[in-house]
Amino acid sequence: MKVNPSVKKICDKCKVIRRNGRVMVICENPRHKQRQG
């Protein structure tokens, strides 16, 4: 899980979602997991 001020899709499988008011990226590749904060 990377915590970045700006989250971007890294590959085609990445999805940007909102969870509990936080913007997150979920992906098949666990290295691509990101959270804004």
Swiss-Prot record:
It comes from the Bacteria. Keywords: Ribonucleoprotein, Ribosomal protein. The keyword Ribonucleoprotein applies. The keyword Iron does not apply. One of its GO terms (cellular component) is ribonucleoprotein complex. GO terms for molecular function: structural constituent of ribosome. InterPro entries: Ribosomal_bL36, Ribosomal_bL36_sp. One of its GO terms (biological process) is translation. Belongs to the bacterial ribosomal protein bL36 family. This is Large ribosomal subunit protein bL36A. It comes from Leifsonia xyli subsp. xyli (strain CTCB07).
